[in-house]
Every structure is written in structure tokens, then in C-alpha cells.
Amino acid sequence: MNVFISVVLFLGSARAASKTGDDEWVHLPNKCEVCKFVSIEMKSAFDETGKTKEVIDTNYRFLDDKGAPPIKYVKSDIRFIEVTENVCSRIMQYNLHKERDGSNRFAKGMSETFSTLHNLVNKGVKVVMDIPYELWNETSAEVADLKKQCDVMVEQYEDVIEDWYKGSQEEDLTTYLCEKHVLKGQDTGCLKETWAGKKGDMAAIAEDKKKKKGKKKKGKDGEDGQKKEKKVKKKKKKSKISDSESSKRRMEAAGFTSDEEEIQKKVPLNQPKTEL
């Protein structure tokens, strides 16, 4: 017999809260938080696109003078444009974690609150909310606003980001963009906020699983490489043996032998003396 427990949770939706002006539920991101995640995602995008050794033909380097020699993709204007145009779409991968404070409320992965609610539903518990179940995984008002502000900030500070990109890039992008330009003379406290995670945090658990999976894959690749190396060595050894055997057969067919015992049989050492 299935027992259904009714869990009534009065969580106002972001849309309803914004209409009523209820600041208790909706905390839109401030300038510091926007710059923090813009710089984080931009650094991540540059890291991902900086591993290639691809060379670009000068015909596609339309921002530079014509006739210049081919350039590396990692130094190209194309890479810069691709990163700046797509960086804000990466913000949509974030979710709102209401159980966290400050800028830490924005993070990838499902929030602890909604992970708990999904688990209850999967166990047959009836969860009653004023947000329909179909909208549980919809983008929150806060994340949507984060993306909107990201678009404006990237466009406004494109020249600053380009100066960093075309420079030595020795200085951290968050420091260069946020502390020295976007938030110059303003509060930069959110830039130092970090989330260590806590026991049972589903987002932290998911991140740990990804890291472990990556390590296992690395180890497996190493083992596969060792196995392949052993197989190659065995094949080489077999080929050497087969080569020596085939050469021996060819010599025997021609009437020659390299076997010491056969030589002793064919040419005995103790032959009878002959007189001249």
C-alpha cells in the first residue's frame, strides 16, 4: 500500500514575487556579481579554446591588414570574437541556489532545495507548491537578469577585454576587468566569495563525480596504452622468431646448415689416415 505524504511548500515564484515587489524572494545580481561570473566564464572559454594548434589563413583574419602571414588561432581576432559573443550564453547553465548567500547563490548544477523536492517526488511523496512541477527547471528571474546584464557589460567593456587579450595576459582577468575597470572605486567583496560546499550538497556532489570520472578516464587511457605497448612488443618478438625460422629453412633447402651437431655428423673429426 502506497502512502502519499502531502508536503505543502509555500515558495513564491520569481515572476509572482517580482510583480508584488517582494524583495524577500527575488535578489537580482548586482554589478560585482555580474562581473565576477562574466570573468569566470570568459577565462574558462579562453582556456578551452587555447589548447588548439590550428593556424588560420590570412583571408579569414579580416580585422588585420591583408597579405599578412598565417597566424595561430590562439592569437587571432576570430578567437576573441567567438569567446565574447558566446560567453553570456554560458551564464544560462547556472541555477539559483537560494540556500546559499551572496554571489554563491549562482552556481551550476541543481540547487539543494530542488534536488530534495525531486527526490521526494521520485519516492512518491506529493509535493504541493504554487510553482507548477513543469516550471521547476525553468530559468529563474535572477539568472535571466544575470545573462541580460552580462550582454550589456561585455559590449560596454569590449575594448578593455580586448586590451587584456592582446596584451601579455599575465594579470588575472577578474582583477584586470572587475577590480581595475568595472568596479573601480566600488565594492569588490563578492569577488573574494567562494563556496567550499557542504555535506549533502547535490551540486558539490555532482562536481566531485565529474572530477573522479575524469581521473578514472585518465587512468584507463594509461592502462590501455600499456596494454597496446605490450602487444606490440609480443608481435615484434614473434616476427623475429618467424624470420629466424624461415631463414633456417631456406639454408637447409640449399644444403647448408647452421646446426653444430649436423656439421659434426657430416664431417667427422676422426678420419682414417691416408698415405701418400
Curated annotation (Swiss-Prot):
<comment type="similarity">
    <text>Belongs to the canopy family.</text>
</comment>
<feature type="signal peptide">
    <location>
        <begin position="1"/>
        <end position="16"/>
    </location>
</feature>
<dbReference type="InterPro" id="IPR021852">
    <property type="entry name" value="DUF3456"/>
</dbReference>
<keyword id="KW-0256">Endoplasmic reticulum</keyword>
<feature type="domain" description="Saposin B-type">
    <location>
        <begin position="30"/>
        <end position="269"/>
    </location>
</feature>
<feature type="region of interest" description="Disordered">
    <location>
        <begin position="206"/>
        <end position="276"/>
    </location>
</feature>
<feature type="disulfide bond">
    <location>
        <begin position="35"/>
        <end position="178"/>
    </location>
</feature>
<keyword id="KW-0399">Innate immunity</keyword>
<feature type="compositionally biased region" description="Basic residues">
    <location>
        <begin position="228"/>
        <end position="239"/>
    </location>
</feature>
<feature type="disulfide bond">
    <location>
        <begin position="88"/>
        <end position="150"/>
    </location>
</feature>
<keyword id="KW-0175">Coiled coil</keyword>
<feature type="disulfide bond">
    <location>
        <begin position="32"/>
        <end position="190"/>
    </location>
</feature>
<comment type="function">
    <text>Toll-like receptor (TLR)-specific co-chaperone for HSP90B1. Required for proper TLR folding and hence controls TLR exit from the endoplasmic reticulum. Consequently, required for immune responses.</text>
</comment>
<keyword id="KW-0732">Signal</keyword>
<protein>
    <recommendedName>
        <fullName>Protein canopy homolog 3</fullName>
    </recommendedName>
</protein>
<feature type="compositionally biased region" description="Basic and acidic residues">
    <location>
        <begin position="240"/>
        <end position="252"/>
    </location>
</feature>
<dbReference type="Pfam" id="PF11938">
    <property type="entry name" value="DUF3456"/>
</dbReference>
<keyword id="KW-1015">Disulfide bond</keyword>
<dbReference type="GO" id="GO:0005783">
    <property type="term" value="C:endoplasmic reticulum"/>
</dbReference>
<dbReference type="GO" id="GO:0045087">
    <property type="term" value="P:innate immune response"/>
</dbReference>
<keyword id="KW-0143">Chaperone</keyword>
<feature type="compositionally biased region" description="Basic residues">
    <location>
        <begin position="210"/>
        <end position="219"/>
    </location>
</feature>
<keyword id="KW-0391">Immunity</keyword>
<dbReference type="GO" id="GO:0005102">
    <property type="term" value="F:signaling receptor binding"/>
</dbReference>
<feature type="coiled-coil region">
    <location>
        <begin position="137"/>
        <end position="162"/>
    </location>
</feature>
